[in-house]
Regions:
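Acidic/His- and Gly-rich active-site-bordering loop/insert found
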Residues: 2-109, 128-135, 315
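An extended, acidic, His-containing surface patch that forms the Zn2+-binding/catalytic region
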Residues: 177-178, 234-310, 318-331, 339, ...
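Acidic, glycine-rich active-site loops and adjacent beta-strand->loop/helix elements
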Residues: 79-81, 103, 140-149, 171-176, ...
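A short core secondary-structure module
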Residues: 154, 209-231
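A generic structural motif
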Residues: 110, 201-203, 317-325
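A common structural junction motif
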Residues: 80, 226, 230, 333-342
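Acidic/histidine-rich catalytic neighborhood of metal-dependent amide-processing enzymes
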Residues: 104, 112-186, 446-448
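Flexible glycine/proline-rich, aromatic-decorated loop/lid segments
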Residues: 183-198, 404-406
Length: 448
């Protein structure tokens, strides 16, 4: 075991206070630019060269530094956060770091800003201890992850040299039933779609429902043609490209248990879909694509009963290997037309990306898992992917490099709800894990 540099907990808390104290929710472009400037300053203070690239949305911050060995690791992060929602639901100001009973609270502390701060402190600890890094790093922090990363791919295509690396590591995912972070050798892809039904040019009295089409009913009928109450996605060809898990993936899937008790307690759900539990639950989350409806509204919104002018639904699909975003959009268009619903307008929303996948026995993925023994007393379990998306496809495709992600948040972390939190030691260990990964990368011949 190496004697790793040690992260300063005091400095980590100081950085968290700065980042959590800056509002930067999805779509708040001015606020996100301010957060990006702060992150750039933090990177410079830790000895990284920095380039802040403007986009039509939030800036993408890129920091880099070479190391003793030519191997370079790209670290993907994001700094945009979900809206805090009603502040009255929070025990603390969501944009002020709070500490209580070994936990830290604040919007972004468990997903986004917290893991980024942990990794920046890991880099700083290495430089402070040794004067240099064991190998090179490229840190990428974007502010439009939650809207599908619409500007990351174009920037990479335009500024390819800024991102060049030999492997990619991200922060995201779950923990197993024992609380140990899971290691993933891939991530699901994403496509988001808006469906719109429009009839009359103005809202009409409800009594006209006997003679005038209602766009909300029309939209509901369309949605019923997309997915059944048995969770089967009905779009023609949707599943055709999917390949089942490999023999090795199946072996792993039979052994991993999710933190079901933690989920049920934190989320206040009695059971999971179809009563799934144990290995079948994990297998479902890892291997299946999804079709989720996350918004449904009418225009205009009206308290008195009316026939609305239009109705809108927003869907998101999480994709597994061999599925492609535009192919899903095209298949949905053809499917609704075949069902006599060609009047439903379909709009692919900005962003989205294919899945990224490395073999679970890839040497880099194994390295990320194996060094877990130095931090957690045992290697991390490797899953091919989990119930989340990230735009790692861009890096994997551009450079032909392996990708991996390490779970951070817990079921109780409430990364989309009030009182987002995480045990402070979890963030410290997340940073220490990176230190061990960098040491291990410098001692291998992983690079091409």
């Amino acid at each position: 075991m190496t004697e790793p540099a040690v992260i300063s907990t005091d400095q980590l808390i100081c950085d968290l206070e700065q980042l959590i104290g800056m509002a930067g929710s999805t779509g708040q472009t001015d606020e996100l630019r301010t957060v990006a400037a702060r992150i750039a300053a933090m990177m410079r203070n830790r000895g990284l060269k920095v380039d802040v690239r403007p986009t039509p949305g939030a800036p993408i911050v890129i920091g880099w530094r070479g190391g003793r060995q030519p191997f370079t690791l790209l670290l993907y992060h994001h700094y945009d956060t979900p809206s805090p929602g009603p502040w009255r639901a929070w025990l603390h100001d969501p944009f002020q770091l709070a500490e209580r009973d070994g936990m830290v609270y604040g919007r972004g502390v468990a997903d986004g800003k917290g893991p980024l701060a942990a990794h920046l402190n890991a880099i700083a600890a290495l430089i402070d201890a040794e004067g240099e890094l064991p190998c090179g790093v490229v840190v990428v922090a974007e502010g439009d992850y939650l809207t599908g990363s619409p500007y990351l791919g174009p920037l990479l295509a335009d500024r390819r040299a800024l991102f060049r690396a030999d492997a990619c590591l991200a922060s995201g995912g779950d923990r197993d039933a024992s609380g140990l972070p899971l290691c993933y050798s891939g991530v699901k892809g994403l496509v988001q779609i808006m469906l719109r039904s429009q009839e009359a040019q103005t809202a009409l009295p409800a009594g006209m429902a006997a003679s005038v089409p209602n766009p909300l009913w029309r939209l509901i009928w369309a949605l019923n043609q997309i997915k059944t109450d048995q969770e089967e996605i009905l779009i023609g060809g949707f599943y055709d490209a999917i390949e089942g898990p490999t023999t090795e993936e199946n072996r792993v899937l039979r052994t991993v248990l999710a933190d079901e008790a933690g989920r049920r307690s934190a989320w206040q759900v009695d059971q999971f879909l179809f009563g799934l539990t144990g290995a079948p639950l994990v297998r479902s989350e890892v291997t299946l694509p999804t079709c989720n409806i996350n918004m449904l509204h009418t225009e205009p919104v009206s308290d008195p009963p009316v026939i609305p002018r239009s109705a809108v639904a927003r869907l998101d699909f999480q994709l597994v290997p061999r599925q492609r975003p535009q192919a899903v959009v095209d298949a949905l268009q053809a499917h609704l037309a075949a069902k006599g619903l060609s009047d439903i307008l379909i709009e692919r929303l900005p962003g989205g990306y294919p899945p990224a996948q490395s073999p679970i026995d890839d040497p880099f993925v194994r390295l990320v898992s194996d060094v877990g023994r130095y931090i957690h007393g045992q290697p991390l379990t490797i899953l091919p992917r989990g119930p989340f998306t990230m735009p790692l496809f861009y890096f994997a495709e551009a450079f032909g490099i392996p990708v991996a992600s390490i779970g951070v948040a817990r079921p109780s972390s409430a990364i989309f709800g009030a009182n987002e939190c995480i045990p402070l030691p979890d963030l410290v260990r997340h940073g220490q894990h990176l230190i061990e990964v960098l040491y291990a990368c410098s001692a291998t011949t992983l690079s091409a």
